[in-house]
Amino acid sequence: MARMDRDAMIAAISTVLAATPDPEGTSDLVAERGHINVAATAAELKGAVQRLAPLRGYRWIVINAGDLFTAGPATLGTKVGILDPTGRVLKAADLPRAK
């Protein structure tokens, strides 16, 4: 699959997951699966994960599959899952523990 830019990734994942823009603006998108941020480049990964940290429920980042080896370490210990633009789960998300 060719590398996608941010707009193409948002369009693709929105179609696959029936995701809509987050009305509160805390994440890029919201779907039945939870909050979703899009990281089209490796440089956007850290910020995308950090913006999801305070949110409750399942949290996901969408990446180009070629960025998996960069995204994996960025999500360690965060319980944030990783999806590709087709909706394929590259790393499962988990619910944050209650504090």
What do these predicted regions represent?
Residues T78-K99:
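Charged, structured surface patches that assemble and position nucleic-acid processing machinery
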Residues A39-P85:
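Catalytic cores of nucleic-acid endonucleases
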